[in-house]
Amino acid sequence: MAPKTVWGYFFIDYIPEPLQVSDKQRVVELKGEVARLFEDCNCKDVVERMNLVDVVQRLGIDHHFKEQIDTALKNIQGAEFNSSDLHEVSLRFRLLRQHGLWVPADQFDKFRRQEDGSFSSDIADDPKGLLGLYNAASLLIHGEEVLEEALLFARRHLESIRRGGGLHDSPYLSEQVGRSLKIPLPRTLKRLEAVSYIPEYSSADDTTYIHPEILELARLDFNLLQHVHQNELRTVTQWWKGLCDVIGPDYGRDRIVECYFWAFSMYYEEEHARARMILARLIMLASLLDDTFDDRATLQECRELNKAIERWDESDDISLLPECIQKFFLEVIRNFAEFEDELEAHEKYRVAYARKAYQLLSKSYLQEVEWCHQGYTPSFDDHVSVSTASAGIQVLCVGMLVGMGDAATKEVFEWMIGSNNRVVRACAEVTRFMDDMADFKRGKNKTDVATTVECYMKEQNVTGEVAFDKIGSFVEDAWKTLNQAALVGDRALLPVVQRVAGLAMSMMVFFHGKIDRYTDSEHLKETLEDLFVNHVPLC
């Protein structure tokens, strides 16, 4: 049995600090001032432009300046750049790749020894440069051995510098190094980075690139957006309470705040409120479906429920199911109908795609239950095929599109639900492998189905330690695929690919350190408090 929720109905009773009209007015003024900084920066050197883009992104206000950032990056990509500073070269590489703009790995050849191609010891005592290299190299794609070497080199020397006390005089750099060694910056959710970076930016040792108007905007914008998220959490928690009144408070795991966080990880901007609210509820319904197959239903009841979900008819005879599962099924049907009601007439077709994804999820859950009851350990490839489907990522990725604006076209839905979608599969692999590593480390599995770690051990006849490391390498391979999709895929799909990557980033939050923070949600509470409860001080 999963631990109880750490949130309960907290957000129903929570009263956010009231917004000041003057704060909203000030944000408008500050946006104009920062936009002018971008205009002024066009006349300055490449390094100043790069630093401005980086600061705006890390402070979490880049959603206000998409056009300015696009223009700046095109200028950065096209401008002559001959720097031999490791931090500057790494920063340019990272910024361009983060935005799907190609830059080759040979940019780092100047920091390698001609004799054997290894990285030069001359950069081994440059923590700022090494940190930049480490974060840049985490955007590697398949076949980039030089960036594999860069990651190992930078990590080894950063850890050595930390152990030797080389960062004692730079506490904020030390904090950034610590964060990146846990989760590299390009795999970190923007809002989480903003929580840490806002105080770091305000107290930076190097004041060259500190702009008071940017800092003030970041603080105000964070709090104003947090107020939006708090109101949404109140609404979605009320929805959850109503659902529990029907199906029972103990039907499944109470993780509505965590489900909202998953939706938030894909889009936190105010203009995506409708999409976020639909997705949060859909994720909760997927979580309850998982709990139903795992804990509520017998094998035969799982089969009957899957048939009912395939038929998707509330008038269907479901009398063979227990009353609680009947109620759950009818609530699923009702909620999907509500999703449709919340869409415009020309958008209503979208819910059919979400329904299809939910049906496929049910089918994968049933397959795992069948294996469990047979005591069957599938081949590693068969397990990955089914367990990446049961990770629920396709439901989340299709569901992400349901409430979005005009960018969510029918063609994008077809692409998202396609069986050969390597982006969705890579995100599912990150999820499945990290989840299974957490399960394996704690010595228990939520169900009795073997994990991918155990399947690999049996098939390859290796120890748990060897299998564990191998599964970890598969996580890295999946990230390479996600990075590659942003660089060489259809540019029109880049915004969607980046949001799927945001979902993969959320898995780093849920499972880093091989801890399952969805099941053991008390480990996630402090992070969610920083995002949804604690205000950023305005001074």
Swiss-Prot record:
* Secretion signal, residue range per the UniProt entry: none
Q: What is its main location?
A: cytoplasm
Cofactors per UniProt?
A: Mg(2+); Mn(2+)
Places the protein is found: Cytoplasm
Q: How does it assemble?
A: Monomer.
Task: Tell me the classification of the organism that encodes this protein.
Answer: Eukaryota, Viridiplantae, Streptophyta, Embryophyta, Tracheophyta
Annotated Gene Ontology cellular component terms = cytoplasm
Q: Which gene encodes it?
A: TPS8
The entry's Mg(2+) 1-binding residues are: 290, 294
Could you tell me the EC number(s) of this protein?
4.2.3.133, 4.2.3.77, 4.2.3.57, 4.2.3.-
Keyword Lyase tagged = yes
From the record, which residues define motif DDXXD motif?
290-294
What's this protein's family per the entry? Answer: Belongs to the terpene synthase family.
The protein depicted here goes by the name: Alpha-copaene synthase
Positions with a binding annotation for Mg(2+) 2: 290, 294
Top-level lineage group: Eukaryota
Keywords recorded for this protein, A-Z? Cytoplasm, Lyase, Magnesium, Manganese, Metal-binding
Q: What is known of its domains?
A: The Asp-Asp-Xaa-Xaa-Asp/Glu (DDXXD/E) motif is important for the catalytic activity, presumably through binding to Mg(2+).
Please, one GO biological process term? diterpenoid biosynthetic process
Matching entries from PANTHER family are given as: ALPHA-COPAENE SYNTHASE, OS04G0344100 PROTEIN-RELATED
Provide the binding site for substrate. Answer: 290, 294, 432
Q: What does this protein do?
A: Converts farnesyl diphosphate to the bicyclic olefins alpha-copaene, (E)-beta-caryophyllene, and to the macrocyclic sesquiterpene germacrene D. Also mediates the biosynthesis of minor sesquiterpene hydrocarbons including delta-cadinene. Involved in indirect defense by producing volatile signals attracting natural enemies of herbivores.
